[in-house]
Curated annotation (Swiss-Prot):
GO cellular component: cytoplasm; Holliday junction helicase complex; Holliday junction resolvase complex
Entry text on domains: Has three domains with a flexible linker between the domains II and III and assumes an 'L' shape. Domain III is highly mobile and contacts RuvB.
A biological-process GO annotation: DNA repair
Region feature (Domain I): 1-61
Xref: CDD domains: UBA_RuvA_C
Taxonomy, superkingdom: Bacteria
Official protein name in the record: Holliday junction branch migration complex subunit RuvA
Gene: ruvA
């Protein structure tokens, strides 16, 4: 029913966040709740699961992560809580690569995943995550193209107290700047951050 929520993160716990969307607080279970900052505006991709016990919202930072969650749910023996626990225990790229390579032993290290369930995950999903892995690899390559001076500047801005999200918002603009040193990038970055 919901595709995504865009709102202010008001509560962060180890298992869920609360997102205020136009005055309504939605409790959203997330594999990575601490990736969000309290008070920040966030776009969270939502999967609504309806069961006899109630309606539960699960939220993800990207459509790809939501897609991986849905793929895990399609595996016999994996419910929403198990899928969320698996995604919380490992970064999505490593998880998808392990499934694509048929690494049953690797998958058994996740909470609630025994050898039988791990084998079922590989059986059901192997070959279905190639596009996902390729997209993540492309994203990693694009992020790896940042110059050492720009990378130092981004780390310095975080050390100055700016959040990762704030720094991420200006990274593309800083990549377009013709600068040779980290100091030049920092000055431009501060100007962009103070403009908000």
């Amino acid at each position: 029913m919901y595709e995504y929520f865009e709102g202010i993160v008001t509560v962060i716990t180890p298992s869920y966040i609360v997102v205020d969307v136009n005055g309504v607080g939605y409790k959203v279970y997330s594999p990575t709740p601490f990736a969000y900052q309290k008070g920040d505006k966030a776009k969270i991709f939502i999967e609504q699961v309806v069961r006899d016990t109630g309606i539960t919202l699960y939220g993800f930072q990207s459509e790809d992560d939501k897609g991986l969650f849905l793929k895990l749910l399609s595996v016999s023996g994996i419910g929403p809580k198990s899928a969320l626990a698996i995604m919380a225990a490992e970064d999505a790229n490593s998880l998808a690569e392990a499934i694509e390579q048929g690494e049953v032993k690797y998958l058994t290290r996740f909470p609630g995943v025994g050898k039988k369930t791990a084998s079922q995950i590989v059986l059901d999903l192997k070959g279905k995550l190639r596009d996902y892995v390729a997209r993540l690899d492309r994203q990693d390559e694009e992020q790896g193209n940042i110059s050492p001076a720009l990378n130092d500047a981004l780390l310095a801005l975080i050390a100055l107290g700016y959040t990762q999200k704030e720094v991420d918002r200006i990274t593309t603009k800083l990549e377009e700047v013709n600068a040779d040193t980290a100091d030049q990038y920092i000055k431009k970055g501060l100007a962009l951050l103070l403009k908000k």
